[in-house]
Amino acid sequence: METALATLSVQGLLQRREQYVEFRDSPRWVFDFPRFKNLSSPLPISPSPQSMSMLSRLVRFLKSHPILFLLLLTPGIPEYLSASSQITLLVVFPPLFFLFLAANVGLYGSGVILIREAMIRWKKGWASVFLLGVAYGIVEEGLDLWTLFYSKAGPVGNLGFYGHWLGVNWVWTVGLLIFHSVYSIGLPIFLFGLVFPELKTKSLVSGTRLAATALCLIADSIFLFVFVSAIYSGYNPGGTLLLFSGLVASTFVVLARKLPDNFLRTNPGQPKWSPRKFAFAGALLFPATLLAGGIAAGANLPPEIPFVLDIILAAFILTRAYKSMGTVNNQEEKVALSIGLVFPIAVFGLIASIGLANPLIIVPDLFFILFSRRLWRKWHQWTLLHRSALQTTLPGFGESPAPLFP
């Protein structure tokens, strides 16, 4: 394993010079002394332009545009990695692909930015984020796309009839709201904090940009409402059901606003689980919740069972993982939990798309593998340094950790 380290010597402190340390399999250190201007900032290792790969160029571009990274990450997981939106449309019918991409970015991107801003400005914790994620899910799937109500909606399948009561697909609804709360909202915010640790508690938009983000979400919702109304021309959920859904979504927003920031607290100290156990717990969430309804429907179980079981399992897995995360030296565990959460979605999306026989179906999975590998290596290196009692700054995504010796 090779990694680059930057250290300061007495001469470097006087002359503002930077030292690079290279670890190899043998305990051999190699030093170099290029010029350095700012002693307080992390020291990035910049490869020559000739040796930079396309991925490295993309990483550098996204590092300088954090909002763009969040906008691409947010629909990337719930839509393109899960194959809910097909990337193969880029070849089959490009105009439709970019139309759906714009709609997804406008909907998911605006939603996650607004919820992240609420989390920071209201000084709330992850419990409030999950409640806001449920409210977002009601807006998208209920008010915009009607999948919470319409029994014959494309993605609903047999869950449009199993557990359908008073005009609502209850089993489908609870699983989908958990999915949006965790994967569409919570996970992108969580990953953003790992990729950009220096921006973890900072607002990304304010003033005019904040208002524009809210208007984008409203405009996108209106567009989808009109679009779905034209597709489902023989169905209308009715004003009463839509109004009730809006009131429920508003209630979740109010609850998130009033919930104490320490409502969901992690146990202090070191992580209680290993990274492998966190990855396993994360990988359990998707099949234990969203897939449970389909299994219960196939077994002809009473719909109340998966409805209640989904809520219990999601709450149990998430709270146990969060409380076991610890408060120090937990970066590897956070990355492992994130990878575990995404892995079953990637597998599900690949299986769902395999019949298309188009090589583009593996593109989202390749990006997931490369992204996960880079993120894991980054924080694994940082953890090794931290455990070696080196004073370090939090590394940025695509940068090597920079130890500062006392």
Give the predicted meaning of each segment.
Residues M54-L101, L145, G298-F316, K323-V335:
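Transmembrane alpha-helical insertion/packing segments
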Residues K124-L215:
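Membrane-interface helix-loop-helix junctions at boundaries between adjacent transmembrane segments
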Residues K63-E79, T213-S221, A279-A288, I339-I345:
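Alpha-helical transmembrane segments
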Residues E79-F97, S151-W170, V228-L241:
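Membrane-interface interhelical loops and short amphipathic "cap" helices
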Residues L264-G398, L404-P406:
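Extended, charged low-complexity segments
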Residues L204-L215, S233-F244, R265-L285:
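Membrane-water interface at loop-to-transmembrane-helix junctions
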Residues A102-E117:
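Central hydrophobic cores of alpha-helical transmembrane segments in multi-pass inner-membrane proteins
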